[in-house]
Amino acid sequence: MQQVEGRNCLPAEVRIGLETLKRRRLERMRLTAQNNAGDGPPVPARSGGDALRTPANCGVRLHANNGTALPSRTTQNKDPFAKRRVDKFDMSSLEWIDKIEECPVYYPTKEEFEDPIGYIQKIAPVASKYGICKIVSPVSASVPAGVVLMKEQPGFKFMTRVQPLRLAKWAEDDTVTFFMSERKYTFRDYEKMANKVFAKKYSSASCLPAKYVEEEFWREIAFGKMDFVEYACDVDGSAFSSSPHDQLGKSNWNLKNFSRLSNSVLRLLQTPIPGVTDPMLYIGMLFSMFAWHVEDHYLYSINYHHCGAFKTWYGIPGDAAPGFEKVASQFVYNKDILVGEGEDAAFDVLLGKTTMFPPNVLLDHNVPVYKAVQKPGEFVITFPRSYHAGFSHGFNCGEAVNFAISDWFPLGSVASRRYALLNRTPLLAHEELLCRSAVLLSHKLLNSDPKSLNKSEHPHSQRCLKSCFVQLMRFQRNTRGLLAKMGSQIHYKPKTYPNLSCSMCRRDCYITHVLCGCNFDPVCLHHEQELRSCPCKSNQVVYVREDIQELEALSRKFEKDICLDKEISGFDSYKQAEKNEPFFEITRNLRNTEVNLIEDAFSGATAADAAKSSPATSTLTSFAQHDVPVLAEAIVCANQADQLYSTTEQTISSPLVKGTDAVGANSSSMADANNGTGSCNASAVEYSGNSDSESEIFRVKRRSGVSVKPASDAKTSNLSDQQVLRRLKKVRPEIQQHNKRPEDYGHCSVPSGRMSMKNLNSSSSCGEEHWRMKRRQLETQQDESSYSAKQKSYSYPSTSYSFRGEFVEMSRDAAAEVRPKRLKIRLPSSSTNRVVEQGSSGQRFTRDDKSLGCWPAI
């Protein structure tokens, strides 16, 4: 919510502005001294009487219409306060003011007023279509804001920002910057200064009609004589009284406690953020403005008007935000100040919160604009991704804070992506916030009555949270699986480990981060291409939270609770936003890819052709490409996987998974194998066709049993395909290559080794593939007699994890149905007794003999 930077490393325009202020101050002091020394009565300066006799009222000097000529300027730089004609903004007529519709106004009862967030959720389906709304409080504050700031908070002072009162061309040589003044005010001093400016401008101390002041503001900013105003924005503090007798102060609408309410998402943040979780004060004067901006991370905001003159707001609905950014990039900003192209470039400049232009520019390009005139005792709510701007009608004091409820997560994900693309440091750890909210919701679902839960957690908000969490876990599983196929090692990090930021895009790495030999800074999973092209693939270490299996189990539960088709494409108040943002296309593209692949596979089409025919319009769906080979393999072994999944579904979610399924290797890439960049070692891909969870086909699970094969039994794996074929013909001469039956694929697992899309298409490759499967079946049959003995003779090394015992029991239970293969390879002695276990899914887990899964120091 902060609008400008401090005075460290001031830009040239700011320095020029301060020099201009200093020259004007010295000139006025010289004129005052001359007038006081003359024979006649002193002539007061136009900046206002006694204000010049005390340096305390420098604000009056800033806003005065000084008719005295300044010394000629020697600098070639333009005066940052001088008004210029801006042809792109037609201000010759203000008739467009009457075309702006009013936003809705709500009058809650005292009973409804007791639950702020519940009431906001109630009005959101309608109010969010306007971007902003007003709520008139049924309870008034008994202690005025001035008393709170002067009596309850003695010594309260604040600095102001100087705002040039003009329009800008928004070109390289003409922009607007708000900068800090060199003055600290008390609340009373600022009020006196602001009232003097108002009285001098209109010869009145009373409020003027709202429409008249609105017209005056746009005339002044385009043609007027006022150079600049002062605005105290982003001032730490609150004007809500701590008195137990103040009805509003002790209510839930006290903004000091608003973000910490029971159903507020931001209460899960461990560190307070000024302006986001803690409120800030906004103390304004005549024509002080807040420029067009959207809240950080597309959060909700609530603003309470404590006292003073009215305040006019302009709001844009959240679903019209792309149109707003498009208009700004094409009709407000010149190309020379935009870094990049499109709406993201305009969004980057808008984050500076200094862009002010008349709303008629938006109306002319069919972007809806709504208006609110806020009075003392009224709240203004801005909804996620709603751009807004406004100005004050005179001295006033407001207070604002951000908040979020679960239906914010979809747009919060979009904001997180945009910050990463622009390399902006986020204020919130979005991934952590999403995971914590999902875990908390699961506890509520287990321990609360459904009726009482619906009152505290709106069903729509629940669906938004569940959908976003499932999307996050899908992406994590896909990318971790791909890295595991490349040979990356998996380690666990404790829950208490700090949440790191990605060194490339600044996202938070709450669940997973990657370290490699050539880059000792953490990298998040969103940089898959960079990780794949890294020369030290085998030296990459993927660090995963030790409670990853709890999150995976929760994701599977949420998948069963909701239908992603309906939720991702049907957010009630954000349908238009979905059409304009790639975030909402993630699941749609995954879903289309899945359907096309299944249909084409059963009709004989290749997986590559299906991938070409599926839509790929979003850069965010790059991880969907890794699902293509998984789907092809899943279709081949669907029957066996159905049987396996039904047998071991409950066991998979046991602590066993915590030890070996942490990477969720469901994103095996055949393209990598084809290019020689990775190997596909998955020997079992599970597909639950009967499950109501649509993402089961994306999951590659480790086989539920284990078998240690002696070296003598594994010799055949070193033979060439032709040798294997000849031996098979000797053993079973009735088998011929042309007698391959399609149903054979329903009773075998995909063989280990390198695979590619070409192998699925070539008839000769299919024949070799068939014989490899037959060979595996024969090996399995030969091992059946000795399987039980091998199971009993297998000894597990000591470990700090408790899942080994459950692992043995589960293996024995599943031995009748599954004959898995797990290789245990002991590296040379130079590896300091480290054992590498490679599972059937191709994942590599490194453990030390002394401490399995320990977290290495970084």
Swiss-Prot record:
Region (Disordered): 737-791, 829-858
Catalytic activity field: N(6),N(6),N(6)-trimethyl-L-lysyl(9)-[histone H3] + 2 2-oxoglutarate + 2 O2 = N(6)-methyl-L-lysyl(9)-[histone H3] + 2 formaldehyde + 2 succinate + 2 CO2
Binding site for Fe cation: 293, 295, 388
Molecular function per GO: histone demethylase activity; histone H3K9 demethylase activity; histone H3K9me2/H3K9me3 demethylase activity; metal ion binding
Biased amino acid composition, Polar residues: 829-844
SUPFAM superfamilies attached to this UniProt entry: Clavaminate synthase-like (SSF51197)
Disulfide partners: none
GO BP field: chromatin remodeling; flower morphogenesis; regulation of gene expression; transcription initiation-coupled chromatin remodeling
UniProt enzyme class: oxidoreductase
Gene3D superfamilies noted in UniProt: Cupin
Disruption phenotype: Defects in spikelet morphology, including floral organ numbers, depletion of lemma and/or palea (Fig. 4D), increased numbers of stamens and pistils.
Role this protein plays: Histone demethylase that demethylates 'Lys-9' (H3K9me) of histone H3 with a specific activity for H3K9me3 and H3K9me2. No activity on H3K4me3, H3K9me1, H3K27me2 and H3K36me3/2. Involved in the control of floral organ development by demethylating H3K9me3 and H3K9me2 in the promoter regions of DH1 and MADS47. The 'Lys-9' demethylation of these two genes is required for induction of their expression.
Protein name (database record): Lysine-specific demethylase JMJ706
Organism listed in the record: Oryza sativa subsp. japonica (Rice)
